A protein has these predicted regions:
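Active-site/ligand-binding surface loops and adjacent short beta/alpha elements
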Residues: 136-138, 146-149, 153-235
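Acidic/His-leaning functional-site neighborhoods
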Residues: 8, 24, 69, 74-82, ...
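Extended, loop-rich substrate-binding clefts of extracytoplasmic carbohydrate-active enzymes
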Residues: 62-120
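Intrinsically disordered, low-complexity Pro/Gly/Ser/Thr-rich segments with frequent PxxP/GP/PP motifs
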Residues: 274-286
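Hydrophobic residues positioned within well-ordered beta-strands of beta-sheet architectures
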Residues: 91-93, 112-114, 125, 141-143, ...
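Acidic, contiguous internal or C-terminal segments within carbohydrate-active enzymes
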Residues: 3, 97-152
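Beta-strand-rich N-terminal accessory domains
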Residues: 1-59, 63-67, 215-237, 284-295
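Generic short beta-strand segments
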Residues: 94-100, 258-260, 293
Length: 296
């Protein structure tokens, strides 16, 4: 699916309903998916964000397999609508329920529609989750877009900056209360993160940075002079992840608003007690949204 207006053009793959290109005036901003570093672009994390402990979710005492970040990113979607309206170009994709064995293994039947809407130099991504089951259903959802570092040179000491904002639009120096150990959270407070954080070769030496409790709802990628290049804003975000593979010469970074988070190490509780879990009654729908805006 391809959408464009006078300023930006995006492309979305049927596989994972994944944004695979974001261009402004011919300049690409989204990571290419080069498998030498990371073979994805902007996967949708659903119905799990991060890694469940032991790759299992527990429902009423029974364990169900669930890999890191869920099944949506490896499932097929169908395009159900493309239109041009007063607010801009709009395209919607719907999860094909039969496209992945992991969908059938999940203990709840959930529908997922993903709408991409262009407005000026911004892309709004709207997720609508529907409970197709006859009992309450539980899920998490999140975004994982990767963006090219502006004017990247591997030999540079600093590759740019990330500026953090809270829900009210105020710059914030967030506090990390946990870090990752084999994909699960363990207590490891880090309190000296500035509201404008430099990106260096060692920023992600210990995996992703995670900011919990809604401290951060918007992260902005800045160039080496501190000028804002693009931002990812999600008023719903309960947690926010910043990540890149710790590999020499990695030229991108991911800005990840989450409505959910990975399990703490050793967690084996019921799915209903997972942190930042969302519950839907039968036939109920819920909508989440985030926006990518290109500034320059």
């Amino acid at each position: 699916m391809k959408l464009s207006n006078d300023i930006i053009t995006i492309e979305v793959a049927a596989h994972g309903a994944e944004l695979v290109s974001l261009r402004k005036e011919g300049c690409e901003y989204l990571w290419s998916g080069d498998p030498a570093y990371w073979n994805r672009h902007a996967p949708i994390l659903f119905p799990a964000v991060g890694k469940p402990y032991n790759n299992e979710l527990h429902v009423d005492g029974k364990a169900y397999p669930m890999k890191q970040h869920g099944y949506a990113r490896d499932s097929e979607f169908e395009c159900v609508n493309v239109a041009v309206c007063e607010c801009g170009s709009v395209g919607t994709m719907r999860l094909i329920q039969s496209s992945n064995d992991a969908i059938r293994q999940y203990p709840y039947r959930l529908g997922l529609e993903v709408c991409y809407r262009l407005s000026g130099s911004a892309v709004e991504v709207i997720w609508t989750v529907e409970n197709l089951d006859e009992r309450d259903a539980y899920f998490q959802i999140g975004a994982h877009p990767g963006f090219l570092l502006p004017d990247y040179h591997a030999e540079a000491a600093t590759h740019g900056f990330i500026r953090y904002y809270d829900r009210e639009g105020n710059p914030v120096g967030p506090v990390m209360v946990s870090a990752l150990d084999d994909g699960n959270r363990v207590p490891r407070p880090i309190v000296n993160i500035a509201d404008c954080m430099p990106i260096t070769a060692d920023t992600f030496a210990h995996d992703a940075l995670m900011f919990e409790g809604g401290q951060v709802t918007k992260a902005v990628l800045c160039d080496k002079e501190g000028r804002e290049v693009l931002g990812v804003d999600c008023p719903h975000a309960e947690a926010y992840g910043i990540w890149a593979p710790h590999k020499e010469g990695c030229p991108f970074v991911c800005l990840e608003p989450w409505c959910g988070i990975c399990d703490t190490k050793g967690f084996t509780g019921d799915i209903s007690t997972r942190q930042y879990i969302h519950r839907l009654a039968p036939k109920e729908k819920y909508t989440f949204a985030y926006t990518i805006e290109v500034y320059r």
